[in-house]
Amino acid sequence: MEELIWEQYTVTLQKDSKRGFGIAVSGGRDNPHFENGETSIVISDVLPGGPADGLLQENDRVVMVNGTPMEDVLHSFAVQQLRKSGKIAAIVVKRPRKVQLAPPQGSLPVDEDDRAFEVMDEFDGRSARSGYSERSRRSSHGGRSRSWEDSPERGRPHERAWSQERERSRGRSLERGLDHDDDYRRPRERSRGRSLERGLDHDDDYGRPGERSHGMSTDRGYDRGYDRGYDRGYDRTYSPEAEYGRRTQPDARHAGSRSRSREHLRSRSPSPELRGRPDHAGQPDSDRPIGVLLMKSKANEEYGLRLGSQIFIKQMTRTALATKDGNLHEGDIILKINGTVTENMSLTDARKLIEKSRGKLQLVVLRDSKQTLINIPSLNDSDSEIEDISEIESNRSFSPEERRQQYSDYDYHSSNEKLKERPNSREDMQNRWSRMGATPTPFKSMGDIASVVGTENSKEPRYQEEPPAPQPKAAPRTFLRPSPEDEAIYGPNTKMVRFKKGDSVGLRLAGGNDVGIFVAGIQEGTSAEQEGLQEGDQILKVNTQDFRGLVREDAVLYLLEIPKGEMVTILAQSRADVYRDILACGRGDSFFIRSHFECEKETPQSLAFSRGEVFRVVDTLYDGKLGHWLAVRIGNELEKGLIPNKSRAEQMASVQNAQRDNAGDRADFWRMRGQRSGMKKNLRKSREDLTAAVSVSTKFPAYERVLLREAGFKRPVVLFGPIADIALEKLANELPDLFQTAKTEPKDAGSEKSSGVVRLNTVRQIIEQDKHALLDVTPKAVDLLNYTQWFPIVIFFNPDSRQGVKTMRQRLNPTSNKSSRKLYDQANKLKKTCAHLFTATINLNSANDSWFGSLKDTIQHQQGEAVWVSEGKMEGMDDDPEDRMSYLTAMGADYLSCDSRLISDFEDTDGEGGAYTDNELDEPAEEPLVSSITRSSEPVQHEESIRKPSPEPRAQMRRAASRDQLRDSSPPPAFKPEPPKAKTQNREESFDISRSHDYKSNPSAVAGNEVSGASTRSCPPPIAAKPSFGRSILKPSTPVPSPESEEVGEGSEEQEGAPKSVLGKVKIFEKMDHKARLQRMQELQEAQNARIEIAQKHPDIYAVPIKTHKPDPGLSQHTSSRPPEPQKGPSRLYQDPRGSYGSDAEEEEYRQQLSEHSKRGYYSQPSRYRDTEL
């Protein structure tokens, strides 16, 4: 005889961008079924390859969508609920199924649809089905129904399936997808406070009469006169959706319970001992849990179990708000937390959800009047239970379609050294649980297989709780007493062991920074075992390293790095109960990081990410090996996978930074080339070449440890995009109470440049006024703001098109002279290179000005949101950040050694004179550039002339770098005589003018400071004292005058105003200078002769050479025949420091120099004269 039953499932679907949820629905109150008039919402089609493929089937009845019942609703209402579900929809469906009341002895073929479903990870939202099934004796959408599955937590005490293993999650999420291979022989899951959802096979679900399949006799199960106690009992398969679905069916309370224990899920040939046992369901209630044994006869058989979980209130504080409210009780099952369904939610996620409630916690609970969950008795562990755990594999997946490979544990000793198997393999099993990430680690040992074989041969049912195996008691041991300081820090119940490290420490570790580091296994015969360390001990300190809050990878590396033979001092504390809870819940590492480099996907299980993404690391020793972390991507969609560990990440980041630096060097070269060139085309070309290498360097490490916190101050605001300058001005003008523009200042105190940097002190002062600081800075400065913990709100205006930018700017700022093409290109480059800095993006629409309202709303929303802040100070930030980064680079300043015009969206004409704007045509290439505003990155026209590609002016630029000349903005007045006076000067005036400048007495100093590039002889002639008014115009016949000469002194011809050519002026001054030089040389010669005559007259006073001086014949042609004029003592201006020429050789050398200058003429080497800066 067949009877129709209904199995209920909860499915979580993720919407595909192209195919939606991949289902079609029909039915409804306004569209009943044409044959039987059924008004249920029915799945009419499932798209192959879609999100629902394999999860939903045709003719499934939709019971609930995201908590909204779908019973007796309109078709349009159901469609609307699916459409507004967003990206994720939790759908509860019921599926019809016919069963045989008296099944044949042979087992039916296993239906593919009844196989155990792949269980999603706690962060994977693809599939979460509740294994609720009910039996209906009426039509497909109503009637009295009976549950064919039961939860051990909510069942009657004697109906609960208590698996005898260490898996006591106590309210934790523990979902297990059980696969087909024989690694799933005897799964035992005891989850305190969790429902274990199970999908059962044909041959086991509705098994033989007398067999205790799932803790209930099938004869009694199909008998309509079943025990009335079950008729009044709970439906033990609980999930929020299933509970709501049962509320809509009045007779769903008639549920026959099934024990979830695996010990009564039998194979095709049931045990005669079990069939001969009296029906346990008919026995009175008992608090004693039952044991169930499942054994496979074939490798492809399934257990058919799906494990679920639910959160309940375990304890309430008497003085807390929950107790005072009076609506909550211990044992209540929490269905929703602030609107989020808690089915299969882990305690960690539930805690975070409560922490984010911000003072308002809304709960939806189900009252458990029997308080079944909190009355669960504690059970002791047995050896066989621990062995059975090794065969339970968690099919957690990184993505819905990928299965995680079986894990292996990491040995902390050498690779060729393995921990020995314990006789009872109990400790070995717990050792294998040392990999504590987000999921438990599956293990299999030979002891487990032997246990299975022995049990199968004995054919003894294990439905009773076996007494716990006696724990071996260690001999009394006296531990070292910790120091008083350690006792004060770590507590009094600590023990200290000290031993010498051998080949390895001999320890396996479990846990992580979230729960602590625990000893998960000890190698036999090692010093650690001999000194009394035990499994379950929490390691608090090793030598001088504090292990509290240490991630498991760092703990492993620290133990490995201890040299062999060195003393190891371990401070530990026995916490076996906490250790068992850690093994049960799978907790270990848990911290958040933000990436500051880019990583591509290496393996199918890896995650690809870019800069600025946030991850939660749940295991730093994935698969028991160093090199990868198991992490969950934090964002709109949660995704789990592998990322490089810290050391590998730093290597990858350093390579990327080096590549960026090399690209930056090329950019600097092209920038300087563009600045040296005065041609517009070359300048534009250099900009285009430069933009390809633009990238933002950072001071952050590869991984930055972050925490989610609320900003307690008004965060600065930085805007990027083609209308950012207009937006900044508009915010400052219209909302002065909320926004204030941070003024830019010159970087150097004495600089006269109009723009430069924004001081951090300025930003701080604006924040102290409770206002948002509006910053006009570069992307690199934004990175510095984040580094200094200011967390700016960075908003990017995304333009729709170049024409749209032009239209908006002409409407918002008609007087603007910026190029829309350039602004549009810069916005696209920013979006490619600096998108990780943006906290929000506003899409511009040139047809309206709604962007301003969006801008204000975005800033307000961003200010109220929590931000990812650095967990601690960055390295190098121990000092006051003002000492290291006291300013931010303004948009007008150079950015990354590049022309800021490549990045800046806040420029005016930028030296382009309208030729690069939307309002004027291009000017000729030779037209000088006109800048409307002077800024640090924009040279003015005068400075542009410096960069003309002429080799001689560049030489003058180098020589013009004399400290005296740069220090003094203008030369002394004596060096700027009026040209007419210079023409009529007599010899005495020329002499006075030449002597009026205060020269240093040392000729070498004169040559070093003022005759740059001249002769390097030790005693040059004092001809450098000639007037310099002719120097500024004595240059090659180039059309561009030397800027240095213009800065040092104005040319005489500019003051004269005479309409003479440059060549004529040069000839005039050449004649004048030549005449003055000859006169000066003659005066010096006469003075020297006078000194010699005086010395010869008074030999007792002056020491002079005896040899008579022979005058230079070349000099006589220039000397005058007039008698020497009497002069005063020689001026110190031209004297040697010794007072006179101390030797005849020096005097002779000096005269030869004068003669050589007379022969060559002063302008025989005009470049030497041009290089003289006076």
Swiss-Prot record:
Modifications made to the protein after synthesis: Phosphorylated.
Ranges of biased composition (kind: Acidic residues): 1044-1056
Pfam families, per database record: Guanylate_kin, PDZ, SH3_2
Principal location listed in the UniProt entry: other
Protein name: Tight junction protein 2
Family: Belongs to the MAGUK family.
Domain of life: Eukaryota
Role this protein plays: Plays a role in tight junctions and adherens junctions. Acts as a positive regulator of RANKL-induced osteoclast differentiation, potentially via mediating downstream transcriptional activity.
Domain PDZ: start-end pairs: 10-97, 291-369, 493-574
Keyword list, A-Z: Cell junction, Cell membrane, Membrane, Nucleus, Phosphoprotein, Repeat, SH3 domain, Tight junction
Compositionally biased spans, kind Basic and acidic residues: 125-137, 146-214, 220-235, 243-266, 274-288, 399-430, 940-951, 978-1000, 1150-1159
Encoding gene per record: TJP2
